[in-house]
Amino acid sequence: CSSDLALEYIYGRVNEFGGLCTIQSETRVSPKHLVGRDDLDGTCDVQLHVPGVLEIIDFKDGMNPVSAEGNPQLELYALGVLSSFELPVNGTYPFHTVRMTIVQPKLALRNMEPVVWCEISLEQMMAKIGRFASAAHATDDPEAPLVPGEDQCKYCPAKGSCSALAQQAVESVGMMFPVVQ
């Protein structure tokens, strides 16, 4: 069962820290208090809070490898979790490291590593706030160009009605066939 690998990984991490951790699963998170937007929320599969480390674990069921490094979905989940903390008077988080992990069991069928992760410092994570805020606010501009592409359109709910994607498809098909005279 695919979920067995995910559970084994989580249990392994819990044992690594002698059980001194908190696990939360299927949690709705939003970075709104840090990014200034309330439309960037999502469901974090698993949060693991261990001494000094916040780990975001995302389960993927596909065969296409997903990288943990530089993964905006995981970064937004991490910012969402951090946004949910009520900071003490000294304003520090209980974490100094953010670990972002992808568990993708089906990759083992392709002899690929099914668990990948990356770690960054809390400061590096917090430095990403401005980039996310700027990118999100840029989408509010009614003149913002639609920029179709394989990565950004893959799971977009507007894919079927996007005029820019349709135009790109027409142009691509036009290049494949010679002009008939």
Question: Model features per residue range: what roles?
Answer:
Residues 41, 72-76, 127:
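A general alpha-helical scaffold signature found inside nucleotide-binding enzyme cores
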Residues 50, 65-102:
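Metal-dependent nuclease catalytic cores in nucleic-acid-processing enzymes
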Residues 81, 108, 120-124:
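Internal, well-ordered alpha/beta segment that forms a basic, Gly-enriched binding/recognition surface
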Residues 123-181:
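Accessory terminal regions of nucleic-acid processing enzymes
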Residues 103-114:
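Short, conserved secondary-structure transition motifs
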Residues 59-60:
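Activation of the activation-loop gatekeeper triad in protein kinase-fold domains
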Residues 1-54, 97-99, 111:
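Metal-dependent nuclease catalytic cores that hydrolyze phosphodiester bonds in DNA/RNA
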Residues 113-121:
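Short beta-alpha connecting loops at secondary-structure transitions
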